[in-house]
Amino acid sequence: MAMITRNTATRLPLVLQSHRAAAVSHLHTSLPALSPATTPTSYTRPGPPSTSAPPPGLSKTAEFVISKVDDLMNWARRGSIWPMTFGLACCAVEMMHTGAARYDLDRFGIIFRPSPRQSDCMIVAGTLTNKMAPALRKVYDQMPEPRWVISMGSCANGGGYYHYSYSVVRGCDRIVPVDIYVPGCPPTAEALLYGLLQLQKKINRRKDFLHWWNK
């Protein structure tokens, strides 16, 4: 009986080792190869949307007519800018110089008007104080659409020399939206004239009739 038990104890580790070797031999030693059909395709980033493409459902004839109407409206607007004089400080002297005979703004169709209801542009020239700010906004609200604002001089742009004063607005763009900034203290007449010409270019890029058509 002791002999049988001894033989069984010695053979058991050998049997376990043989079964383990057989199980390991059935394992895959290498990864299966991928077929060509399962290879991932390369990712292509889509391009940005085109801003010059016509709206969907708009024919070529309608697109041509709409663009010509916009061109006609922009031509009339940029050729008849009527500024509202809002001189507040020494920059107003240069604004008056620009409107005088030497530079002759009339040849550009720019005519100063005394009433905001007859104007489509406001030239804020000078230092805007906290007490004058409500009046500026009231005059701006009386102007018909479309309307534009030119900030003339360092004081109107950001407070200028009086930036840290308790009674000065640090930029008229805190009260009304500004389209053109003319730097300088004070700016020359040529600088204001250049700002008006830039405003004409900005008006020429408007697409009011197209936006109205797509509503």
UniProtKB/Swiss-Prot annotation:
Reactions catalysed, as given in the entry: a ubiquinone + NADH + 5 H(+)(in) = a ubiquinol + NAD(+) + 4 H(+)(out)
Region feature (Disordered): 32-58
Keywords: 4Fe-4S, Electron transport, Iron, Iron-sulfur, Metal-binding, Mitochondrion, NAD, Oxidoreductase, Respiratory chain, Transit peptide, Translocase, Transport, Ubiquinone
InterPro entries, per the entry: NADH_UbQ_OxRdtase-like_20kDa (IPR006137), NADH_UQ_OxRdtase_20Kd_su (IPR006138)
GO biological process terms held by the UniProt record: aerobic respiration; electron transport coupled proton transport; mitochondrial respiratory chain complex I assembly
Residue positions binding [4Fe-4S] cluster: 90-91, 155, 185
Tagged with keyword Metal-binding: yes
Location within or outside the cell: Mitochondrion
Swiss-Prot/TrEMBL cofactor(s): [4Fe-4S] cluster
Any one GO cellular component localisation term in the record: mitochondrion
UniProt cross-references to Pfam families, sorted A to Z: Oxidored_q6
Cofactor note: Binds 1 [4Fe-4S] cluster.
Residue spans of biased composition, Pro residues class: 46-57
EC number annotated for this UniProt entry: 7.1.1.2
MF terms (GO), sorted A to Z: 4 iron, 4 sulfur cluster binding; metal ion binding; NADH dehydrogenase (ubiquinone) activity; quinone binding
Protein family (similarity comment): Belongs to the complex I 20 kDa subunit family.
Subunit structure as annotated in this protein's UniProt entry: Complex I is composed of about 45 different subunits. This is a component of the iron-sulfur (IP) fragment of the enzyme.
Function: Core subunit of the mitochondrial membrane respiratory chain NADH dehydrogenase (Complex I) that is believed to belong to the minimal assembly required for catalysis. Complex I functions in the transfer of electrons from NADH to the respiratory chain. The immediate electron acceptor for the enzyme is believed to be ubiquinone.
The protein's name: NADH dehydrogenase [ubiquinone] iron-sulfur protein 7, mitochondrial
